[in-house]
Amino acid sequence: MANKLRKSNAIEWATATGTVPLLERSCCHSEDAALEPQASKTSHREQAPILRHLSQLSHLLIIAGLLIVCLAGVTEGRRHAPLMFEESDTGRRSNRPAVTECQFGKVLRELGSTWYADLGPPFGVMYCIKCECVAIPKKRRIVARVQCRNIKNECPPAKCDDPISLPGKCCKTCPGDRNDTDVALDVPVPNEEEERNMKHYAALLTGRTSYFLKGEEMKSMYTTYNPQNVVATARFLFHKKNLYYSFYTSSRIGRPRAIQFVDDAGVILEEHQLETTLAGTLSVYQNATGKICGVWRRVPRDYKRILRDDRLHVVLLWGNKQQAELALAGKVAKYTALQTELFSSLLEAPLPDGKTDPQLAGAGGTAIVSTSSGAASSMHLTLVFNGVFGAEEYADAALSVKIELAERKEVIFDEIPRVRKPSAEINVLELSSPISIQNLRLMSRGKLLLTVESKKYPHLRIQGHIVTRASCEIFQTLLAPHSAESSTKSSGLAWVYLNTDGSLAYNIETEHVNTRDRPNISLIEEQGKRKAKLEDLTPSFNFNQAIGSVEKLGPKVLESLYAGELGVNVATEHETSLIRGRLVPRPVADARDSAEPILLKRQEHTDAQNPHAVGMAWMSIDNECNLHYEVTLNGVPAQDLQLYLEEKPIEAIGAPVTRKLLEEFNGSYLEGFFLSMPSAELIKLEMSVCYLEVHSKHSKQLLLRGKLKSTKVPGHCFPVYTDNNVPVPGDHNDNHLVNGETKCFHSGRFYNESEQWRSAQDSCQMCACLRGQSSCEVIKCPALKCKSTEQLLQRDGECCPSCVPKKEAADYSAQSSPATNATDLLQQRRGCRLGEQFHPAGASWHPFLPPNGFDTCTTCSCDPLTLEIRCPRLVCPPLQCSEKLAYRPDKKACCKICPEGKQSSSNGHKTTPNNPNVLQDQAMQRSPSHSAEEVLANGGCKVVNKVYENGQEWHPILMSHGEQKCIKCRCKDSKVNCDRKRCSRSTCQQQTRVTSKRRLFEKPDAAAPAIDECCSTQCRRSRRHHKRQPHHQQRSSS
């Protein structure tokens, strides 16, 4: 086995998304000359050990790079593990059992494509690693896998002695050699002419067309038992490498759970799990029309060939994992009439007694109807059917084709064509006939019934109503002024679709359309310069929206809609066309399958060069948990643009905002997707407030912005928690740093971390944000002692009283109405601002210091004259007992007190207020014999708004650590010097002599020996140092 690996020079590493061969030799940095074999054998032997070590190091770097890039692919691959049947509808499940494209990092690669491995920084593009997306069969499925190999050994030998390595090349070349020696990459180039010719396809799915599902190898995978004779028809549109599909199914059965695309051999090429809930699909359009819509994105080149050669089959699956109910299949084929199709019909065998005639088992059909309502109106009918022939009718079989008004039993069309060679699977029959405008009107409203039966055996009959065509499509437009000189700010959007009964459902949204101008909204037909009004939609206009339906739609309107000649016009009393737009058809899938689009509005501060800029955006999340979006712009000049998704938890002041760049683009149209978006971000699209923004890439200016409606997220895309530790906003771990984005939500707005504010619910409460949680506390008013000339007064709107002159208090009490005088208003606005809080002149308050709350030991005041803020701290009285006996009555008490019965007189106590060298609790009460000016004039010192006399000593107080008793400061001739207390060796020896053995013999009433806390700490540190010293000396001597 080892020999085989050495011969192949590759080690295969299997992942969920592919088998990635890792090279056994370094090939990516070919410019390193040390890795190349030298011409001389002697030099080669000398460099062999170096090459071996460099090769091993290169292996590790390549493996690490591929692991990083493919890590996301591994996770995605596990999500898309192949499953034949759907799991429980309520749990997470894989929604793409067959994967027809490779995901390398976050880049999708087409099946059959090749590329150089890009490992990102710091490795970059590895030009000697060639990767390929290959098809690997796995349990009758084709699964795409990535395979990479070393192509350095495939380089041709250089024709010179000193070849060089060029940037972006793997193989070395000779200087001046213009021939490219690199291995050419096989990049499939699409043939535009080929794709233009393969656009419209259709399929009929009945029991008879599902013949290949009944083979011996397929019986274990599919159930074809169909007692109700369920049939279905499909339409396909191939557009820009994507295959859009639409299905009409029988009303006798519910919505299928999956769609498969298989080849002639029954190998599954692609499988899509359909979105189903208890109430049906989440799609508004599919619920309204009863259709099944979707798209197969990026069809590989090999599969396009299968589609072009009519070798592709489609399979509908019903049931679940426990029970497979039914599987219907049909061949996807081209039909010329599909290009002009206006109506469709699904033909089924009748069930008179709830049972199908055994001779009609597996019978069904579909009709492709094209009409023209000109001067000579006509109808073209293409029938695709089976099962209406007798056993002996094997040639030239006669049929009866009827179109009738079932309500009146009035036959409108009746012909008897003949089929030369009847087939048990597919028969195609084309008929044409003139038809009246009245009958076309009945056809457009779904009133006509089409019947195909055998002329010889009339009981062999299939029938169905003619309805709007089976294709899933909507028609949309942007509403904007058509004149560049227009000064209006009005804009809007419109989108419509056809129901099966022929009614036209419309949705119109406008912006800056004033109802006072009596707007008139109408459907118009635009043919050149002529504009004809067809329908008036004004009665349904309300609050900038017009939502409704046009029940009786004429054939002319229907033809104009499909031809792209129908538009929406908004007029006013002064302008016949304020804003308008022409409806354009779009297939329904992915982003356009959401509930409704959003209007991207021009911002007020936007540059005046884009006065009529407007946009429309669709956004949805598919069944594979990928985000899809589509943006259409109008009035935006050609430039490089950026599409951003903005998210905030709720619409509130100060809410945290996150922005994600979805894509950079240019032009007026963008259709894209975002793969592997985390579940936590997907759920925000449904639960949070989201905006879609279009920015200019160069100027960084916001051009358009629109608010997303609630985007529905499939249940299996929600985040899954594996334990009970569900994260709760506000939970925190003290060992972790506070996130800078942490905010608190209170009273309808957000506040930043450590921010303080007054509660909007109670203005006498102060709140603060700490670790994502808001805490509020009632304002504590300081105890005030007013002067004899002042009076305690509490004004309206203030939480605490303040001392004001008696005259001002009397005037305030006599005043019955609020101040209207300018002088009074100015006087009310006078005050001080501390932080973000305003305090009126003369007010006093305790500072709010979270998380401890109000500091009641400090009282701040706003000077009524100078508006200066002073915050002196409370001066504690001297203690009348030993400091060891003193205590604080509660945790927030400012001063210590002595226990009852422990006070001692000032004469008998060692510490007296007159001794400046002894410090008491917080500050000592000194006799105010001199003013501050006199103290400073006599050589005193001022430290932090506190005055010390010349020669006075004290311990400094730090706000974060309290009083520093081991540091002593002294004021000497207006200069402050601070020193830390130093302990001698004798002091430390004296401290250690007080042992526990001596304490046993001490009397209980004896005073405890004094222990200096500062010296004890220094002595312990010194002892530890001496204990370690012999060990170090021993190591040094050894």
UniProtKB/Swiss-Prot annotation:
The chain crosses the membrane at residues 54-74. Abuts the dorsal dpp-expressing cells in a lateral stripe 14-16 cells wide. Later in embryogenesis it is expressed in neuroectoderm and in the endoderm spaced along the anterior-posterior axis of the developing gut. GO terms for cellular component: extracellular space; Golgi membrane; plasma membrane. The keyword Cell membrane applies. One of its GO terms (molecular function) is collagen binding. Residues 197-337, 339-471, 474-588, 592-713 form the CHRD domain. Putative negative growth factor. Antagonist of dpp, a protein involved in patterning the dorsal region and in the development of the neuroectoderm; dpp inhibition is enhanced by tsg. Required for establishment of a narrow stripe of peak levels of BMP signaling in the dorsal midline of early embryos, that will give rise to the amnioserosa. During pupal development, plays a role in specification of the posterior crossvein in the wing. Exhibits both agonist and antagonist activities towards BMP signaling during pupal wing patterning. Component of a complex composed of dpp, sog and tsg. Interacts with palmitoyltransferase Hip14. This is Dorsal-ventral patterning protein Sog. It comes from Drosophila melanogaster.
